[in-house]
Amino acid sequence: MIRNFRRRKFCRFTLEKINNIDYKDIILLKNYITENGKIVPSRITGTRARYQRQLSRAVKRARYLSLLPYTDHHR
């Protein structure tokens, strides 16, 4: 019987002891956005629920202030 072994994902923000996610930190936010501009879910990234909420809020603020694009491909 073959079992799928999945590596445990760790929350980067918990390990680095980051309390608040800043919307002006574009380099950090780009790691959690797909090529199309969607926010990557926590089941893929491994972030905890608290930080995922902060992350989505920060991405939405950065989009509103034109620091991040809503989508990459405009046609």
From Swiss-Prot:
One of its GO terms (cellular component) is cytosolic small ribosomal subunit. Coiled coil: none annotated. Pfam families: Ribosomal_S18. GO terms for biological process: translation. Keywords: Ribonucleoprotein, Ribosomal protein, RNA-binding, rRNA-binding. One of its GO terms (molecular function) is small ribosomal subunit rRNA binding. Disulfide bonds: none annotated. Gene3D superfamilies: Ribosomal protein S18 (4.10.640.10). It comes from the Bacteria. Part of the 30S ribosomal subunit. Forms a tight heterodimer with protein bS6. Belongs to the bacterial ribosomal protein bS18 family. Binds as a heterodimer with protein bS6 to the central domain of the 16S rRNA, where it helps stabilize the platform of the 30S subunit. This is Small ribosomal subunit protein bS18. It comes from Wigglesworthia glossinidia brevipalpis.
